[in-house]
């Protein structure tokens, strides 16, 4: 049976929203480059120079004979770097990059990015830019089906999103525990509700924010499990959650990300499941790629976070990540 408890809005009041990137254009219709800086942390890290960089832009034909034809809107996650340069200086260099894009396929459709321009201020991000990178196409492009193979393509940077990593400690993405199941355990999940205000252009105002669309996504935190063959009650789990003193924020890791920090006491078992870290990061790029693409330039705000307590899925239940399931005749095999 599922039990749901609401967190108090004070848990995300300070850092629970992201400002939009409002599109503006030059006289010829080209988008004006912009940079957005997000700080989801509490500011207790001594060195404030670490940041995560995420580029947004247009995938277009690189043929110089005429005006480039835009094919799709895409993104390029550059990862974490350390820099004291101003955001505007980083944006300027990013817009001057010559980034080649190529469509290919592996387990799924991929986009390959590599840069041909020497780096100066963006040197801390050279690992992605100079050695090339491959991403799941649906995670970094809104319409990969429109990208041709017979015409060279480039990625023209238009927007830059910088997330300052100002929290002390590590930003842990607890990937190993996300599929962990246990007998007689209670799964602790979060249901997050966002209110979305898409970037509609300067000077346009929506009078009633209650009419804005909302979207939800769910993340798994961990499991509450007793040593004996008994199950914790929902009320007891709620008490343990309240003692954790969870604080929530929105960041720009991989597009949009949920940041969680425990400011209180965490159970030893759950703390171990989370790698003994109290600062967690859940990028929507890996949780819900469709919602993440929708939020690339939008204003979004947390309006509700709920703790969802559910019985842990039995271990004998198999997880099928493939549409091909083995059959008794051996006609199909998942390798």
From Swiss-Prot:
Q: Which InterPro entries match?
A: Matrix_C (IPR042539), Matrix_N (IPR042540), Matrix_Paramyxo_C (IPR055413), Matrix_Paramyxo_N (IPR000982)
Q: Where in the cell is it found?
A: Virion; Host cell membrane
Any single GO molecular-function term of the entry would be:
lipid binding
What's one GO BP annotation on this UniProt entry?
virion assembly
- Alphabetically list the UniProt keywords: Host cell membrane, Host membrane, Host-virus interaction, Lipid-binding, Membrane, Viral envelope protein, Viral matrix protein, Virion
What is the protein's major site of localization? virion
Q: An example Gene Ontology cellular component term from the record?
A: host cell plasma membrane
Q: How does it assemble?
A: Homodimer. Dimerization is critical for virion formation. Interacts with host ANP32B.
Q: Which family does it belong to?
A: Belongs to the morbillivirus/respirovirus/rubulavirus M protein family.
Query: Function of this protein?
Result: The M protein has a crucial role in virus assembly and interacts with the RNP complex as well as with the viral membrane. Associates with phosphatidylserine (PS) and phosphatidylinositol 4,5-bisphosphate (PIP2) at the plasma membrane. Interaction with PIP2 triggers matrix protein lattice polymerization. Matrix proteins induce host membrane deformation and curvature necessary for virion assembly/budding.
Protein name per its UniProtKB record: Matrix protein
Please tell me the species this chain comes from: Measles virus (strain Hu2) (MeV)
The gene is M
